[in-house]
């Protein structure tokens, strides 16, 4: 087994590389004699490998494809993704050859973020197994797998005014709102680097030797059943926030969030956190502040200082008795505190899983990517939260959502029961004989038999 060498290809944007590394660390721990070479940009690797790691995980830097002196303009992250993909396959193949020479071990398996769609071609050229990781929900993978079917049934670029139309032909989905499909399926720029990447991925991922997913089977039974029938070894091995929780020793609470929560009533606090890549525009920040003030809802808000200037004048002073704004919060600890009654977020997949793990209902304000689809599932399928009225924060819409989720009435009870049920299912899935634990064992076996 000491000759096994897994090439791991990371997607170096947002939280993707960290999620892939978390799974690799679990595999490296289970397979101490297998070498895992983690191919990633130097910038991403340097942020991930800050503490000692397993001896059998070897970080290997590759180029990000950005020309010297390049200035990020209006294209933003999309442009950087395009530059990365332009040379990624060649850069990775060269790096893999160097890693093989350095280690004296040929590649026996290619593991990758599913966004690295060409990793399947690399595995095929090497005649080894290919294991792409899908870091989001089974449902969002499904719509990319069925993009051609959706485009056949829905005229591309023709959805304006039809956003509320209900689709019933996508396998695994009883119903799906047309406007809840991710951008790039039938709306938005279908030729952008990101849209093209997702389309290619959806068309090629069926060739995978195994397809691990950052979710648990009990969350999406009909979708999982359909995808299991389409793929070899479709393996839900998450939620990663439960299987690979961050080491508590590294978590600080420099702003005293937990001590502040200790003084609040049980289930009364709205925790607001939009992650690292999505912040509402100024008018929505102002509307949220007005709603919190008028409703006198206790709140803990994780927000960078530079955004505070958009609040109504005097807001911080007037709400100081029941509100706290910090530039960073220990989110997992905050959500698991008994005083928190709702999590207001962008409906990114990591945030949804953290809500489920903590048993805290959600108010969603989706922005891009899979956010709209996640919001649909949260509100209409799992019934563990609500999407903000109209999809953007207004004062009245925010007050309505807060009232729906925090009021001690039938709706609040139903939300808490639903998310409590999914919390229990998630914990059982990652338990000793749970579905995710059993799927992980299968993945371990596949790693050592896929060359």
UniProtKB/Swiss-Prot annotation:
Involved in the formation of flavonol glycosides required for pollen germination. Shows a strict specificity for UDP-galactose and flavonols as substrates. Acts on kaempferol, quercetin, galangin, iso-rhamnetin, kaempferide, rhamnetin, morin, myricetin and fisetin. PANTHER family: GLUCOSYL/GLUCURONOSYL TRANSFERASES, UDP-GLYCOSYLTRANSFERASE 74E1-RELATED. The active site is at 16 (proton acceptor), 113 (charge relay). Disulfide bonds: none annotated. Optimum temperature is 50 degrees Celsius. Belongs to the UDP-glycosyltransferase family. Transmembrane segments: none annotated. Residues 1-30 form the signal peptide. This is Kaempferol 3-O-beta-D-galactosyltransferase. Keywords: Glycosyltransferase, Signal, Transferase. Its EC number is 2.4.1.234. It is an enzyme of class 2 (transferase). It catalyses: kaempferol + UDP-alpha-D-galactose = kaempferol 3-O-beta-D-galactoside + UDP + H(+).
